[in-house]
Every structure is written in C-alpha cells, then in structure tokens.
Amino acid sequence: MSESLRIIFAGTPDFAARHLDALLSSGHNVVGVFTQPDRPAGRGKKLMPSPVKVLAEEKGLPVFQPVSLRPQESQQLVADLQADVMVVVAYGLILPKAVLEMPRLGCINVHGSLLPRWRGAAPIQRSLWAGDAETGVTIMQMDVGLDTGDMLYKLSCPITAEDTSGTLYDKLAELGPQGLITTLKQLADGTAKPEVQDETLVTYAEKLSKEEARIDWSLSAAQLERCIRAFNPWPMSWLEIEGQPVKVWKASVIDTATNAAPGTILEANKQGIQVATGDGILNLLSLQPAGKKAMSAQDLLNSRREWFVPGNRLA
C-alpha cells in the first residue's frame, strides 16, 4: 500500500499546497515537509510563510526551510527522515544529486505540462502562448537535469479558447494530485513503467518577464490575444499611454484585413477598442489603467476617450 510509504513533501506555493492536502486527505504518511524560507510580502513587507508551510503546520507536520539543499547540514535533514520517496511540487530549490539519491525510491516531481513539451519554469503560460490544443501534468522521476527525468504518469486536459493561465492553473491543480496518488501507488507496488523522454520533441518554457508582456503590435492579433490570456494573472499584458501602463485583461480577434500600420486605433466604441496589428485586428475588451480597477472598454472610453482617438497609434 502506498499509504505505508514514508514521504517527504517539498513545495512552496498554493499549487504545491493542494498536492500536499490531497496526500494527507488520502491517508499518506508524510514524515516531513520542505518549503522555502518565509518571504517579505505585502505593503508592510512582513515575513509571510508559504502556503505549504501554513498547511503543514496546521496538520502538525515537521517543517524544514533551508535556504539551499547544497550544504551538508541541509542534506542531513533529508537523510534523517529516512524517506521512501520525496515528492517535489514547485519547490523552487535545486535538489543536488546526493539528495535525489537519498530516498529509497528517489524523488518524483509534478510538472505542469505534457513532457517533453515545455520543460522549464513557465509551462502553463507557454502552452497558452503557443496556442496548444491541450496540456496536462506529468509525474516524473527526477534526475540532475531540468525536467529531463523518466516519465511515470501523465494526465491531459484540453485548453479552451477562454482559458487563462489562472484557469489552467486551477485545472492542473486538480489533475496533479490525481496523477501523484496513482503514481505513488504504482511505485509502492512495483507497477510503475518509467518512459524515457523523446529528446526530439523537447521545447523549453522560458520564464516570463514584464517586458515580454508589453504588447507588440507587429505581432498577429491571434498571437496577441493568446499572450493576453497566457500572461493573466501575471505579468499581465500591457500597453503605454501618456507614460502610464495600462493592463489588458481581455481581447478578441477580428479577422478583417487592414492596411493600417500596426498599433493604429481603427474604432473605439461600445463593442471595444479595435487596433490594427501585424495581421488582423485586436479588439480590446477589458483594460486597467494604473491605480484603477479593471473595467470594460466602454467604461474606460467614458472617462478617457482622448486616449483612443481613431487614427492615433498606440506605442
């Protein structure tokens, strides 16, 4: 029974906490929890515990918060727990080879893509950005590479035309625990079937930056609309008007050809703010000026119509 495995859990954000909660709810024996050190957050920059730490302490589990797992004393914390397996979900620290080899069954990771597609830091966002039809989670055996280990279990889900990174995150946070619990059972009873990743199918999910999220009107309307969903809720697609950043929460594509230069405002009405792109027209539907709440294009036009005069070009 997988419930008898001695499990170390390592994770930090809410996505990881949902996996820990599922393990505990299904009766698994979690002998210790590793999470990142408390970080300053909020306006007061008060030290805040991670969601994983909060849950672990609620459940009375031993919590360890090393700054790194490279020092011998940090590695000894892992060794002393004599775990059968270490489950790693969005932990945020590198596991050295010595740590990977400590548990009897090694370390397994829940990754938010269908490997080998989208190895790396931002798999959920990149699957949307690229226009993938589906994504999912992969449970893999960890090795010293970046998401290069053998795949143990996969679950997939479709990506809809309405999905944002936020909604996709929630879907994968439901799928991941299902896959994890199944994988632990297979590891415990010896039925897991590791599958080597096909290196010819590898793509990398590079980290997002605020600068990348700045709208580049030379791109196609379809690509920009995907970017707006991929970068929601962070870092948020944005444009600059009169030196102010304006976030874009929602847009749609109008498949009409235009000879106008990319960035040219074509129409601004209750249907939205229509802007020429490198290919097609992007219709801005929901925007958020600096210091304000998100609002419909119509509401923004009521107060800032001078920003969106047809014929003007957005930077």
Curated annotation (Swiss-Prot):
The reaction(s) this protein catalyses: L-methionyl-tRNA(fMet) + (6R)-10-formyltetrahydrofolate = N-formyl-L-methionyl-tRNA(fMet) + (6S)-5,6,7,8-tetrahydrofolate + H(+)
Enzyme kind, highest EC tier: transferase
Gene Ontology annotations for the cellular component aspect, listed alphabetically: cytosol
Residues annotated to bind (6S)-5,6,7,8-tetrahydrofolate: S113, L114, L115, P116
Record's keyword annotation contains Cell membrane: no
Known EC number: 2.1.2.9
Database matches in Gene3D superfamilies: Formyl transferase, C-terminal domain (3.10.25.10), Formyl transferase, N-terminal domain (3.40.50.170)
Keywords, ordered alphabetically: Protein biosynthesis, Transferase
GO molecular function, one term: methionyl-tRNA formyltransferase activity
Cited function: Attaches a formyl group to the free amino group of methionyl-tRNA(fMet). The formyl group appears to play a dual role in the initiator identity of N-formylmethionyl-tRNA by promoting its recognition by IF2 and preventing the misappropriation of this tRNA by the elongation apparatus.
Cross-referenced PANTHER family: METHIONYL-TRNA FORMYLTRANSFERASE, METHIONYL-TRNA FORMYLTRANSFERASE, MITOCHONDRIAL
Sequence similarity: Belongs to the Fmt family.
Protein name, UniProt field: Methionyl-tRNA formyltransferase
Gene source species: Shigella sonnei (strain Ss046)
Gene behind the chain: fmt
